[in-house]
């Protein structure tokens, strides 16, 4: 804070002494970053990148590997340091897709946004292409800016069989300085326009839960959130097991979703996926990450008159 005040004072003095200079500082804010989140782009990921149509199968069907490869290509296209993290499950090798946006001044400090891209043997539009599309859209937006801390975006595999991908990542990075992890899991079912979300996490994650709730209030365009206590059934749990602050952001009506783990959990099901609601969930998460990783404003520029 002292540095920012000093820069402002020096800038003011320079402008006062040299009236031929005019400041054109952009004044980049977290709100500016959040405004770049696009429902059109989010929908394109959900409809066209992750194989969410009737008959698709991201469980053990052919669309599983195709979706993984598409996620890798997207991360790589955003300029992230992209890799596959292999792990074993039931005698076979699977991989998490990891994209790293390295921080400028505190690269050792890490914030993670994750979602599982696998499904049961169905299209898995809400569970959980909706969350994975959110990670893709957040990565697209945040990769365009600089932050003090490092942002890591992860598409986890084999969540449905017991959180195997997130367990593998958390255990491999147990000594990292992970300051916060958010799992996006089922963020697109919003019957009757209730516009509510649930936040799950243990008491040890109370701080990150509160900060995410605040971000939802600030950047969620009318979404409200409910602290729903503890739930260990998503990819935040392995991070909490290692004492990292972590939480789950999920649609409020998750327990009443009639298409959960059904063949018609698909973008083709009429009046099912609420793209606007899901996009606002993503905007909230982008705001949280930009705030906590500390957005670096664009430098001031000056024009000679």
PLM region spans:
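N-terminal capping segment at the start of a domain
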Residues: 26-65, 116-118, 256-268
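Solvent-exposed loop/turn segments at secondary-structure junctions
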Residues: 88-92, 104-106, 117-122, 157-162, ...
């Amino acid at each position: 804070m002292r540095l920012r005040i000093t820069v402002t004072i020096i800038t003011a003095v320079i402008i006062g002494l040299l009236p031929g200079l005019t400041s054109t500082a952009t004044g980049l804010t977290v709100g500016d970053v959040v405004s770049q989140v696009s429902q059109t782009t989010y929908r394109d990921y959900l409809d066209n990148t992750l194989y969410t149509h009737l008959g698709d199968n991201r469980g053990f069907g052919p669309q599983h590997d195709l979706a993984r490869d598409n996620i890798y290509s997207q991360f790589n296209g955003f300029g992230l340091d992209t890799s596959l993290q292999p792990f074993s499950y039931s005698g076979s090798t699977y991989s998490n897709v990891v994209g790293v946006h390295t921080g400028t001044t505190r690269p050792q400090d890490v914030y993670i946004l994750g979602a599982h891209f696998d499904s049961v043997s169905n299209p898995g539009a809400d569970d959980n292409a909706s969350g994975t599309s959110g990670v893709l859209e957040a990565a697209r937006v945040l990769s365009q800016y600089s932050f003090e801390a490092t942002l890591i975006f992860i598409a986890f595999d084999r969540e449905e069989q017991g959180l195997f991908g997130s367990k593998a990542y958390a255990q491999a990075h147990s000594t990292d300085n992970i300051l916060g992890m958010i799992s996006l899991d089922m963020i697109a079912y919003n019957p009757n326009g209730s516009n509510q979300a649930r936040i799950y996490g243990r008491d040890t994650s109370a701080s990150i839960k509160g900060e995410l709730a605040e971000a939802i209030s600030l950047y969620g365009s009318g979404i409200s959130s409910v602290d729903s206590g503890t739930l260990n059934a998503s990819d935040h749990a392995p991070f909490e097991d290692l004492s990292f602050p972590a939480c789950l952001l999920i649609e409020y009506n998750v327990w009443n979703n009639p298409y959960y783990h059904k063949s018609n959990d698909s973008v083709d099901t009429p009046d099912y996926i609420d793209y606007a609601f899901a996009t606002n969930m993503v905007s909230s998460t982008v705001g949280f990450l930009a705030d906590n990783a500390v957005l670096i404003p664009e430098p001031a520029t000056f024009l000679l008159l």
